[in-house]
């Protein structure tokens, strides 16, 4: 165990734990000590020769480490290592920057633990600098007895109107603010059978309102008041991920039915008249080669802390009072993010791109999401049947190759041997097994290509397994002159392509939104700022 000291004291209340490769006097002083306190002991963390820290290694090393720092009077461990932080606190994730936790190791629960950043990571991901600054400030406040957990007291005033009269009054009060933020909590992410459970508004990062919509026993009256408010409000509304909130507001408040295109256009023209989207602002301000995170909670973390709810994917499982406060904090955080990044947007001369390209594109995207892609169910069924027939013919073609038949015998022999190794008395024979080659089995495909056929391994998966994807199969064609091998590989490529359509696209099409015109509609969720390159992406589907 190696260590570095920065003062002449013999007792230390605070210890920085960091990988031995990062245990540098100059770097630790520059990135931590100069910003916090010189009376900090820096201690190395052990990793094996493969630069990994398995649980058994951390367990053995932590016992020695904790005894050592405890004998020196250490009260707080500053852990600049995600693996050791999770081990010491039993946390599932290492993302709780800005919080003080108890050490979970028996006998050392009196020691506090906080997460920091290894300065070496800044070279690959400069955006981690904000986390390091946040961590340093937290520790400094803790030492000075001024530590306050993130997110505490960010709500200065809040109202949760419940009666129609109260809701109407609070909505009326919003008209005096030239700019407000808005956020909705819904029953799901798709349009079908969805609705707005609650809605919140805020006029700055500390004050706002939230109330029930569909969850209200008089939901139709609440929706009527909401629609009237949006029609009359002349200010600017800030959203985070505006396409979702606006899409749901139009769908719930302005469309009489899922095919009401007139209501769609009315809503689009209304909501996109004066608005901001902090997700797009963040994208323009932070886009870089290392990648960026556009989520509201990530970008407001130093303000609101970790206020996420595990049950938020199903709002019916969340206490309604808790949900309303959560909804409001989303609005407050939206304001915080706007105040944080909008000045930077202007300073970087990106206002023209933001207003004339990005925001205009959001209106088009929301229209696309609401209208959807129509599919003829009869033609979908026919296409599905044809694809399944074609896939079966490809599999029969593959099974007809003698090489595949020989490989199936190998699979049977192997299965028989493995079964008999587990049996003590009664033994099995190859006649007890009927194994067909499964081209969708990565393990079997690896065995066929690289062991039985002896083809070279060209690339590996992220998990270190020999790759067998369509692109790899295409490349393998250039590494054999055997005509049978080439025919088998070409057949496997076709099977891979058709299988993907049959197993991925067809089910998604069948699960689309069946509307009154007897057509199935696909409603995507498009991400304008979801990629480094700026291309449009989609999810669900």
Regions found by a protein language model. Give the residues of each.
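Conserved "right-hand" nucleotidyltransferase catalytic core of DNA-directed polymerases
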Residues: 141-213, 266, 271, 291, ...
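Conserved RNase H-like, two-metal-ion catalytic cores of nucleic-acid enzymes
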Residues: 9, 13-16, 21-41, 149-298, ...
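Alpha-helix capping/helix-boundary segments
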Residues: 83-85, 244, 444
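Active-site catalytic pocket residues across diverse enzymes, especially alpha/beta-hydrolases
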Residues: 91-92, 253-257, 341
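Residue-level signal for well-ordered alpha-helical positions
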Residues: 90-91, 126-128, 252, 287, ...
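Phosphate- and divalent-cation-binding pockets in alpha/beta enzyme and binding domains
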Residues: 86-87, 247-251, 448
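A polyanion-binding, active-site-adjacent surface
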Residues: 1-148
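Short glycine-rich phosphate-binding loop at a beta-alpha junction
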Residues: 75-80, 235-243, 438
């Amino acid at each position: 165990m190696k260590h570095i000291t920065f003062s002449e004291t013999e007792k230390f209340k605070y210890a920085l734990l960091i990988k031995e490769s990062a245990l540098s006097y100059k770097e630790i002083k520059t990135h931590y000590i100069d910003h916090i306190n010189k009376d900090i002991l820096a201690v190395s963390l052990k990793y094996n020769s493969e630069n990994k820290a398995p649980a058994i290694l951390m367990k053995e090393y932590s016992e020695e480490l904790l005894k050592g720092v405890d004998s020196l009077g250490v009260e707080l461990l500053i852990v600049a290592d995600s693996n050791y932080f999770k081990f010491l606190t039993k946390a599932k994730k290492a993302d709780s920057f800005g919080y003080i936790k108890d050490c979970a190791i028996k006998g050392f629960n009196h020691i506090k633990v906080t997460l920091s950043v290894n300065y070496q990571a800044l070279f690959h991901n400069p955006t981690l600098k904000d986390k390091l600054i946040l961590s340093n400030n937290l520790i400094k406040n803790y030492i000075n007895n001024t530590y306050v957990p993130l997110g505490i007291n960010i709500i200065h005033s809040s109202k949760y109107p419940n009666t129609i009269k109260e809701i109407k009054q609070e909505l009326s009060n919003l008209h005096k603010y030239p700019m407000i933020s808005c956020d909705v909590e819904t029953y799901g992410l798709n349009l079908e059978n969805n609705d707005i459970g609650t809605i919140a508004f805020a006029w700055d990062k500390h004050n706002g309102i939230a109330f029930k919509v569909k969850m209200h026993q008089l939901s139709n009256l609440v929706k009527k008041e909401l629609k009237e408010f949006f029609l009359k409000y002349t200010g600017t509304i800030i959203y985070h991920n505006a396409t979702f909130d606006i899409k749901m507001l139009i769908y719930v408040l302005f469309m009489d039915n899922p095919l009401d295109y007139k209501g769609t256009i009315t809503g689009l023209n209304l909501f996109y008249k004066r608005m901001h989207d902090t997700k797009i602002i963040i994208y323009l301000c932070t886009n870089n080669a290392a990648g960026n995170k556009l989520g509201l909670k990530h970008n407001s973390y130093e303000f609101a802390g970790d206020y996420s709810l595990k049950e938020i994917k199903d709002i019916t499982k969340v206490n309604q009072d808790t949900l309303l406060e959560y909804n409001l904090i989303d609005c407050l955080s939206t304001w915080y993010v706007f105040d944080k990044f909008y000045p930077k947007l202007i300073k970087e001369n990106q206002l023209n791109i933001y207003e004339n390209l990005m925001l205009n594109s959001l209106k088009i995207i929301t229209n696309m999401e609401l209208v959807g892609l129509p599919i003829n169910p009869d033609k979908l069924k026919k296409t599905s049947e044809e694809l399944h027939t074609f896939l079966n013919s490809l599999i029969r073609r593959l099974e007809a190759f003698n090489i595949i038949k020989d490989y199936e015998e190998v699979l049977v022999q192997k299965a028989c041997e493995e079964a008999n190794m587990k049996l003590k008395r009664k033994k099995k024979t190859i006649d007890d097994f009927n194994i067909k080659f499964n081209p969708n089995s990565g393990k079997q495909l690896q065995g066929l290509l690289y062991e039985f056929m002896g083809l070279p391994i060209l690339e590996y998966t992220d998990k270190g397994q020999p790759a067998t994807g369509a692109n790899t199969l295409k490349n393998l064609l250039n590494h054999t002159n055997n005509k049978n091998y080439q025919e088998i590989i070409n057949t496997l490529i076709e099977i891979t392509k058709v299988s993907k359509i049959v197993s991925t696209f067809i089910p998604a099409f069948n699960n689309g939104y069946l509307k009154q015109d007897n057509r199935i509609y696909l409603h995507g969720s498009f991400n304008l700022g979801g990629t480094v390159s700026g291309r449009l992406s989609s999810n669900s589907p």
